[in-house]
């Protein structure tokens, strides 16, 4: 640029520039506004919404990690006007909840001090305002997620009949299974951790895995013919159940060690049933049915180059 303001550090990295807008602290929520989903099955999962008001530009959220589970921001929604909702997802069964810090460029802030340093863009709008608690980045990491959320998948213990391993569709009672719990991650060591680490990580990585089971049975209302057939009415039943888990990328923090792994975001199963009836080899009718919910596409996407930004929440408490 031929004019303006530019401040860099010893590594020639940009700290403040009149060409770009710095992030500044706006608001903090210590508890979620609502719990959108919770279960202790499949290793446990929690979905929370944090509501923010009076935010005039698109915000960037950061969160704490009070447990050593996996966390991720899965949605930032402009619900109406200047109102925003941040959805945070976490694995595990703990009752602890993360705090969420909201940052945005200085156009969204309202300074109360009369003194400080302000940097303007060429259009006259503010790019930096020291009175608004600018974001201090203490660390960062580009992370990638393993291609497979789990080292191996087994259908052991699952039934092909009516998805009966996870739900009784007559009583709506749910059951727990461990066949999809993720165990794969990539690990990164981060030096110089702050006193209260907060993280900006938007979950982009997604994966879906399925386990399909099929089973059939024959029933003879008559006399077996000795060759595997039936003299009389014969019914043949076919069942197929497709169990699935949908994963989102998450990060785990433990005293300077950062892991990029997976969180089960959704689970379910779809079943199909078919019955064929014959009398002396002649078809006399059939019956079929289906239930449950269909899985997503069985693929893995966006696993590489996901950015994690680290700051110190203590500066904004």
Residue map of PLM features:
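Extracellular receptor-binding modules and their adjoining Ser/Thr/Gly/Asp/Asn-rich linkers
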Residues: 1-49, 90-243, 251, 267-317
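Ser/Thr- and Asn-enriched, surface-exposed coil loops between beta-strands
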Residues: 77-87, 253, 257-260, 268-270, ...
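A cross-kingdom feature marking solvent-exposed beta-strand/loop segments within repeated
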Residues: 67-97, 279
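Extracellular and analogous surface-interaction loops
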Residues: 49-56, 78
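Broad, structure-driven detector of short, well-ordered beta-strand segments within folded domains
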Residues: 241-256, 261-263
């Amino acid at each position: 640029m031929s004019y303006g303001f530019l401040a860099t550090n010893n590594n020639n990295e940009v700290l403040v520039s009149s060409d770009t807008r710095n992030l500044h602290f706006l608001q903090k929520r210590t508890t979620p506004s609502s719990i959108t989903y919770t279960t202790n099955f499949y290793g446990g999962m929690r979905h929370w919404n944090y509501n923010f008001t009076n935010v005039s530009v698109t915000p960037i959220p950061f969160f704490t990690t009070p447990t050593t589970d996996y966390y991720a921001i899965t949605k930032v929604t402009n619900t109406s006007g200047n109102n925003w909702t941040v959805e945070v997802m976490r694995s595990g069964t703990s009752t602890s909840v993360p705090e969420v810090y909201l940052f945005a460029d200085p156009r969204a802030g309202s300074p109360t001090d009369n003194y400080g340093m302000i940097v303007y863009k060429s259009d006259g709008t503010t790019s930096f305002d020291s009175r608004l608690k600018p974001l201090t980045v203490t660390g960062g990491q580009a992370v990638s997620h393993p291609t497979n959320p789990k080292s191996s998948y087994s259908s052991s213990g699952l039934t092909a009949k009516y998805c009966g391993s996870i739900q009784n569709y007559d009583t709506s009672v749910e059951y727990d299974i461990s066949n999809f719990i993720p165990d794969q991650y990539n690990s990164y060591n981060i030096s110089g951790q702050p006193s209260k680490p907060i993280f900006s990580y938007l979950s982009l990585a997604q994966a879906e895995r399925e386990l399909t089971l099929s089973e059939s049975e024959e029933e003879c209302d008559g006399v077996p013919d000795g060759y595997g057939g039936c003299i009389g009415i014969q019914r043949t039943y076919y069942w197929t159940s497709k169990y699935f888990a949908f994963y989102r990328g998450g990060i785990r923090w433990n005293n300077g060690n950062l892991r990029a792994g997976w969180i089960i975001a959704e689970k379910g199963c779809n079943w199909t049933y078919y019955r064929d009836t014959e009398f002396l080899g002649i078809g006399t009718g059939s019956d079929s049915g289906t239930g449950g919910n269909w899985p997503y596409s069985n693929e893995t996407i966006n696993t590489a180059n996901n950015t994690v930004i680290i700051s110190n929440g203590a500066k904004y408490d």
